[in-house]
Structures are given as structure tokens and as C-alpha cells.
UniProtKB/Swiss-Prot annotation:
Residues 1-263 form the Peptidase A1 domain. This is Cardosin-G. It comes from Cynara cardunculus (Cardoon). Optimim pH is 4.3. Active from pH 3 to 7.5. Its EC number is 3.4.23.-. Keywords: Aspartyl protease, Cell wall, Disulfide bond, Endoplasmic reticulum, Extracellular matrix, Glycoprotein, Hydrolase, Membrane, Microsome, Protease, Secreted, Vacuole, Zymogen.
Amino acid sequence: DSGSTVVALTNDRDTSYFGEIGIGTPPQKFTVIFDTGSSYLWVPSSKAHSMYESSDSSTYKEQDFIEATEEADNVFLNRLFDGILGLSFQTISVPVWYNMVNQGLVKRFSFWLNRNVDEEEGGELVFGGLDPNHFRGDHTYVPVTYQYYWQFGIGDVLIGDKSTGFCAPGCQAFADSGTSLLSGPTAIVTQINHAIGANSEELNVKFGLTPEQYILKGEATQCISGFTAMDATLLGPLWILGDVFMRPYHTVFDYGNLLVGFAEAA
């Protein structure tokens, strides 16, 4: 689309996708995961990869922030990226990309994640539009049901052509570019990992996953299931549609109309 900004993404073994951003003037460069499952911008200290020095920026403004000097988990240890840039809603925390919205620059953004780790182009994030080279047909759009994550309702979940019955009354899900796997209720994921075959149904449109799409390569001859169990939340049964789901489906996050759209990736 005219006026869109394209960010090239790097695919790290199908486990994470990250691209480059610049902070300040002149820009100090970082590689970050663009995460639709959070709203925070994490920039690590000099003890990690890159360091943001506010005094080197002519556009830096005093603002409230939280500095973590010690982290129990090894979040960024041995990672190829420096930090995380959240693309979710301000209910969690006011995200950086809201500045683009408030300036009238961006009403939507879209992801294409390349499954082929051998190709130079690992993926693509487009702020402000879509890249027609990376999807086929029309997108199926669903309304955002809760402005915390990019959350929407889904119908029944099938294993093969058989209903699991668990989500027949309806479940909630959100598309999360910062999560590697596809997480769902333990009862269903246990069945899926036993049968190793799954589909999700929404608005009478089926979005299927083939074994090539949900099985990850491990060491040597090892294969890893792309499904992981997660018990019910306060919002009820919840699915996190991570990169396993977003790779085969070009995904649009439409803030202007509060919609999430999926089309076959190309």
C-alpha cells in the first residue's frame, strides 16, 4: 500500500522472527521481536547486546520508565535479538506504535512469516498496509472481542474431521507473533498431540494445519510438536495462535476497524 513501511524479518530456526528498529536521533539500532502479545518495549542494558544511551539522542524526552537491573529468567541470553517491541493494546501499557496511530500514519499492520529457514528473507512486517506478494485470495476478518491482546472468538476445534466438542460453545484466541508454538487447553492439546492433526473453525471457514506446518525440527532426527498445553485463564479457555499458526496464514491486525484477518500465505 502507498505510505506503508516494510520491516524485513529474520527467521531464527522457526522459533522467533525479529527485525531492526532505530531509537532516537541519530537512530541507535536494535534488533527486536515485534510481539502482538505484549505492549512493552524492552531495550536491554550494556550487559546484554545493544545499549540505548538517551544522552546520544537529540529527540529524547524525559518520561517515566521502569529499569530492571536483575532478571531471574535468561530472557535474552544467547539470543540473536536485543529486545521486544510490543504491538498489543494500551490496556496493558501504552505501546510505541500508538504514536504512529495518533499521528495518523498507521491504522493497521500485517505479518508474513517464512517457514523456509534456508531463504534469505525470513519474513515481513508491513506498517500501514499489506504486501500482496505474500498472500493468496481474500482475508477472513474476525472482530476483536477484548482490547488487551488481539483477541477474537473461535468456534469448534477439529482433530481430522471430528469435533473435540470442547470449544463448540465458543472459545477465545489471540494471534501472537511473539510466541513460537500454538497453545491451547490441556484437554484438547493432549488429544492433538496423540492424533497429531488439527483444524480450527471460525465463521464457517476452516483454517487447517498440515504436519509440515505444526511439526518443528529438533536435533538430528528429533521432531517436536508445535502444540503446547495451557490451562484455562480468567477469560475461560484460551488459544494462543503463535508462529506455528501465523506461518501458513498471512495475518492482518486492523486497529482502525478492530479486526484480525487471515489469508493463505504465499
